[in-house]
Amino acid sequence: MLLIGVAGTTLSAQEVDWLQDDAVAGVVLFKRNFASRAQIVELSAALREATPRPLLLAVDQEGGRVQRFHEGYSALPPLQGVGALYARDPEAALELAFEHAWLMASEVRASGVDLSFAPVIDLGRGNRAIGNRAFSDDPHVVAAFARAYVQGMHAAGMPVTLKHFPGHGSVLEDTHVDLAVDVRPLETLECEDLVPFAAGIAAGADAVMMAHVVYPNVAPEPAGFSAHWIEVILRGRMGFRGVVFSDDIGMAAVRGVGSVAGCVHAHLDAGCDVVLVCHPELVNDALSAVAGRRSNTAALIGLIGRGALGWDGLLADVRYGSIQSRLLERFGTST
């Protein structure tokens, strides 16, 4: 039901107490939680030991400027860099996307973390928050990359989360700091922004993260608070059967929805399976809000990883060094 954030590199007594609540489905990790590779492995183990229930551990490890784990991890290029190769050599570009996905997912899983919220398949059309996180401005090119990235993450044993549905890339506003409104009709969105999502879903994506963007000609609420977007379009028309995550309720774009409790209930009532409460100062209010609400975590069990190699196993895998070398040769260490 809730995926919460914790404050630092170790767990406080209060955070351990939070994890005992059945409403807490897991924890999302950030740069503030990272000190070293060994420390993340220890923190992941401590989180799992803190509760007898299965716990989902997640991170945003996209590459480029959105990479929470640094020292000891590959300096992954932003997706725009991979996408730029497509015009010259589509086959090579898609192979690099597969390898980018495999490398990212393998390192995250080796650290004891189940999934990275990836890939971004928003269109790269000037949005301040998306920027070079997007593969391309062409929906059909992004669709091809979505398929390759799904395959690469799955090859590493990691579930895939497509984001940010139904598409964040065609508005300028950054929803971390402002409300974003996209006035295009559904017919236009279906021919553009939804094309990569349809491709990713068809390729077997396991989850979708919603956008805090309002599409007033489709529904009056931000998409993550809209049953029309989630139940009618995503699950109904597009046939998606996986897990639906909200984006973080601490972002400025959701302030108009109301209180922490109002945001949590609105997401769940609209059809989100999991609500992200990334700021620790909001966790108590979120837990109070859902007290007594029935928790259904069955959908999440399939996202919790099994059989990861660990770092010793990954470092011994011949694919690891060769893929690292190819990405380094192509992109250097620039992020």
UniProtKB/Swiss-Prot annotation:
GO terms, molecular function: beta-N-acetylhexosaminidase activity
Active site feature: H176 (proton donor/acceptor), D247 (nucleophile)
Alphabetical keyword list: Cell cycle, Cell division, Cell shape, Cell wall biogenesis/degradation, Cytoplasm, Glycosidase, Hydrolase, Peptidoglycan synthesis
Swiss-Prot/TrEMBL catalytic activity: Hydrolysis of terminal non-reducing N-acetyl-D-hexosamine residues in N-acetyl-beta-D-hexosaminides
Disulfide bond annotation, renumbered to this chain: none
Protein purpose: Plays a role in peptidoglycan recycling by cleaving the terminal beta-1,4-linked N-acetylglucosamine (GlcNAc) from peptide-linked peptidoglycan fragments, giving rise to free GlcNAc, anhydro-N-acetylmuramic acid and anhydro-N-acetylmuramic acid-linked peptides.
Entry protein name: Beta-hexosaminidase
Species this chain originates from: Xylella fastidiosa (strain 9a5c)
